[in-house]
Protein backbone atom coordinates (compact mmCIF):
# COMPACT_ATOMS: atom_id res chain seq x y z
CA UNK A 1 0.00 0.00 0.00
CA UNK A 2 2.86 2.38 0.81
CA UNK A 3 4.30 2.13 -2.70
CA UNK A 4 0.90 2.94 -4.23
CA UNK A 5 0.38 5.87 -1.86
CA UNK A 6 3.92 7.16 -2.50
CA UNK A 7 3.41 6.95 -6.28
CA UNK A 8 0.03 8.73 -6.00
CA UNK A 9 1.72 11.50 -4.03
CA UNK A 10 4.46 11.69 -6.65
CA UNK A 11 1.88 12.01 -9.46
CA UNK A 12 0.29 14.91 -7.55
CA UNK A 13 3.59 16.73 -6.98
CA UNK A 14 5.63 16.00 -10.10
CA UNK A 15 4.27 18.01 -13.03
CA UNK A 16 6.18 16.25 -15.83
CA UNK A 17 6.38 12.49 -15.20
CA UNK A 18 8.84 12.16 -18.08
CA UNK A 19 11.28 14.71 -16.63
CA UNK A 20 14.11 12.71 -15.09
CA UNK A 21 15.37 15.68 -13.04
CA UNK A 22 11.94 16.47 -11.61
CA UNK A 23 11.35 12.83 -10.62
CA UNK A 24 14.84 12.60 -9.12
CA UNK A 25 14.22 15.80 -7.16
CA UNK A 26 11.03 14.29 -5.69
CA UNK A 27 12.94 11.11 -4.73
CA UNK A 28 15.57 13.28 -3.03
CA UNK A 29 12.78 15.03 -1.12
CA UNK A 30 11.47 11.62 -0.04
CA UNK A 31 14.91 10.63 1.20
CA UNK A 32 15.29 13.99 3.00
CA UNK A 33 11.94 13.47 4.79
CA UNK A 34 10.43 16.43 2.92
CA UNK A 35 7.77 14.58 0.90
CA UNK A 36 4.94 12.07 1.25
CA UNK A 37 4.93 10.58 4.79
CA UNK A 38 8.24 12.26 5.77
CA UNK A 39 9.79 8.95 6.88
CA UNK A 40 12.81 9.21 4.57
CA UNK A 41 11.95 6.01 2.71
CA UNK A 42 11.54 5.23 -0.96
CA UNK A 43 9.06 2.39 -0.70
CA UNK A 44 9.52 -0.73 -2.81
CA UNK A 45 13.29 -0.37 -2.84
CA UNK A 46 15.64 -2.79 -1.16
CA UNK A 47 15.49 -6.31 0.20
CA UNK A 48 17.26 -8.01 3.09
CA UNK A 49 18.64 -10.80 0.91
CA UNK A 50 18.44 -9.57 -2.69
CA UNK A 51 20.74 -6.55 -2.54
CA UNK A 52 21.90 -6.44 -6.16
CA UNK A 53 18.55 -7.31 -7.69
CA UNK A 54 15.39 -9.13 -6.77
CA UNK A 55 15.01 -11.87 -9.41
CA UNK A 56 11.28 -12.01 -8.72
CA UNK A 57 10.95 -8.31 -9.56
CA UNK A 58 12.88 -8.68 -12.81
CA UNK A 59 10.56 -11.45 -14.01
CA UNK A 60 7.43 -9.70 -12.74
CA UNK A 61 8.28 -6.41 -14.46
CA UNK A 62 7.94 -7.85 -17.97
CA UNK A 63 4.42 -9.05 -17.15
CA UNK A 64 3.57 -5.71 -15.53
CA UNK A 65 4.63 -3.90 -18.69
CA UNK A 66 2.42 -6.10 -20.88
CA UNK A 67 -0.55 -5.52 -18.57
CA UNK A 68 0.11 -1.76 -18.55
CA UNK A 69 0.04 -1.71 -22.35
CA UNK A 70 -3.18 -3.77 -22.42
CA UNK A 71 -4.81 -1.43 -19.87
CA UNK A 72 -3.55 1.82 -21.46
CA UNK A 73 -1.38 2.65 -18.43
CA UNK A 74 1.95 3.05 -20.25
CA UNK A 75 2.59 6.50 -18.71
CA UNK A 76 2.19 5.07 -15.22
CA UNK A 77 4.48 2.17 -16.08
CA UNK A 78 7.08 4.61 -17.44
CA UNK A 79 6.96 6.55 -14.16
CA UNK A 80 7.39 3.36 -12.12
CA UNK A 81 10.32 2.36 -14.35
CA UNK A 82 11.93 5.76 -13.95
CA UNK A 83 11.61 5.56 -10.17
CA UNK A 84 13.06 2.04 -10.25
CA UNK A 85 16.07 3.36 -12.19
CA UNK A 86 16.60 6.61 -10.26
CA UNK A 87 15.95 5.48 -6.67
CA UNK A 88 19.15 3.41 -6.32
CA UNK A 89 21.14 6.40 -7.56
CA UNK A 90 19.45 8.75 -5.07
CA UNK A 91 19.90 6.29 -2.19
CA UNK A 92 23.58 5.80 -3.05
CA UNK A 93 24.21 9.55 -3.24
CA UNK A 94 22.20 10.61 -0.20
CA UNK A 95 22.93 7.73 2.17
CA UNK A 96 26.35 6.76 0.86
CA UNK A 97 25.15 3.18 0.41
CA UNK A 98 26.99 1.59 -2.48
CA UNK A 99 26.27 -2.11 -1.94
CA UNK A 100 23.35 -1.90 -4.31
CA UNK A 101 19.66 -1.24 -3.83
CA UNK A 102 17.04 -2.40 -6.27
CA UNK A 103 13.29 -2.61 -6.62
CA UNK A 104 11.76 -5.51 -4.77
CA UNK A 105 8.85 -7.58 -6.04
CA UNK A 106 6.37 -5.46 -4.09
CA UNK A 107 7.36 -2.28 -5.94
CA UNK A 108 5.08 -3.19 -8.86
CA UNK A 109 2.45 -5.34 -7.12
CA UNK A 110 0.15 -2.50 -6.03
CA UNK A 111 0.28 -1.06 -9.54
CA UNK A 112 -0.85 -4.44 -10.89
CA UNK A 113 -3.68 -4.64 -8.35
CA UNK A 114 -4.87 -1.18 -9.41
CA UNK A 115 -4.80 -2.17 -13.10
CA UNK A 116 -6.92 -5.20 -12.19
CA UNK A 117 -9.41 -2.94 -10.33
CA UNK A 118 -8.75 -4.68 -7.02
CA UNK A 119 -9.83 -2.47 -4.08
CA UNK A 120 -7.03 -0.98 -1.99
CA UNK A 121 -8.43 -2.70 1.13
CA UNK A 122 -7.51 -6.09 -0.37
CA UNK A 123 -3.84 -5.31 -1.14
CA UNK A 124 -2.55 -6.35 2.29
CA UNK A 125 -4.55 -9.59 2.45
CA UNK A 126 -3.33 -10.49 -1.05
CA UNK A 127 0.23 -9.74 0.08
CA UNK A 128 -0.23 -12.18 2.97
CA UNK A 129 -1.92 -14.85 0.85
CA UNK A 130 0.99 -14.80 -1.57
CA UNK A 131 3.47 -15.39 1.26
CA UNK A 132 1.74 -17.57 3.84
CA UNK A 133 2.97 -20.86 2.38
CA UNK A 134 6.57 -19.60 2.37
CA UNK A 135 6.25 -18.17 5.88
CA UNK A 136 4.83 -21.47 7.11
CA UNK A 137 7.55 -23.50 5.40
CA UNK A 138 10.25 -21.29 6.91
CA UNK A 139 8.71 -21.64 10.36
CA UNK A 140 8.62 -25.43 10.01
CA UNK A 141 12.28 -25.41 8.91
CA UNK A 142 13.18 -23.23 11.90
CA UNK A 143 11.45 -25.64 14.29
CA UNK A 144 13.22 -28.64 12.77
CA UNK A 145 16.60 -26.88 12.58
CA UNK A 146 16.61 -25.46 16.12
CA UNK A 147 15.66 -21.88 15.17
CA UNK A 148 18.38 -21.52 12.54
CA UNK A 149 17.14 -18.98 9.97
CA UNK A 150 17.05 -20.38 6.44
CA UNK A 151 18.18 -17.90 3.79
CA UNK A 152 17.44 -18.22 0.04
CA UNK A 153 21.16 -17.95 -0.79
CA UNK A 154 22.00 -21.15 1.09
CA UNK A 155 23.19 -23.98 -1.12
CA UNK A 156 21.83 -27.43 -0.56
CA UNK A 157 24.37 -30.13 0.25
CA UNK A 158 21.89 -32.89 -0.56
CA UNK A 159 22.60 -35.03 -3.60
CA UNK A 160 20.57 -33.94 -6.61
CA UNK A 161 17.55 -36.11 -7.35
CA UNK A 162 15.70 -36.42 -10.63
CA UNK A 163 12.18 -35.01 -10.66
CA UNK A 164 9.48 -37.68 -10.71
CA UNK A 165 6.11 -36.56 -12.13
CA UNK A 166 3.14 -37.00 -9.79
CA UNK A 167 1.57 -39.65 -12.02
CA UNK A 168 4.68 -41.83 -11.64
CA UNK A 169 4.98 -41.60 -7.86
Predicted segments with their positions:
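Non-transmembrane, aqueous-exposed alpha-helical and coiled segments at domain scale
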Residues: 1-169
Amino acid sequence: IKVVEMMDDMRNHVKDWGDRDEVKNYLEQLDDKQAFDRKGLIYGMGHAVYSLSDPRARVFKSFVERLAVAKGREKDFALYSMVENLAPEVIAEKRHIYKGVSANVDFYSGFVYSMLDIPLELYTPIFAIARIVGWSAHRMEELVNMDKIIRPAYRSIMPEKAYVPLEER
